[in-house]
């Protein structure tokens, strides 16, 4: 999982990327291409 300041550019890399908030953190998850996982931090 990558840790990035801004997830906007990471989200646009694949059309299945979803922006999710869990426990006060923002994540990018992708069910089809798992390598696009990222967390904002």
UniProtKB/Swiss-Prot annotation:
Q: Which GO terms describe its cellular component?
A: ribonucleoprotein complex; ribosome
Record's keyword annotation contains S-adenosyl-L-methionine:
no
Q: What keywords are assigned to this protein?
A: Ribonucleoprotein, Ribosomal protein
- Disulfide topology: none
- Looking at the keywords, is Ribonucleoprotein present? yes
Q: Which Pfam families match?
A: Ribosomal_L36
Task: Output the GO biological process annotations, alphabetical, semicolon-separated.
Answer: translation
Superkingdom per UniProt: Bacteria
What InterPro entries does the entry give? Ribosomal_bL36, Ribosomal_bL36_sp, Ribosomal_L36_bact
Question: Under the GO molecular function aspect, what terms does this record hold?
Answer: structural constituent of ribosome
Belongs to which family?
A: Belongs to the bacterial ribosomal protein bL36 family.
Q: What is this protein called?
A: Large ribosomal subunit protein bL36
What is the organism lineage in this UniProt record?
A: Bacteria, Pseudomonadati, Pseudomonadota, Alphaproteobacteria, Hyphomicrobiales
List the gene name.
rpmJ
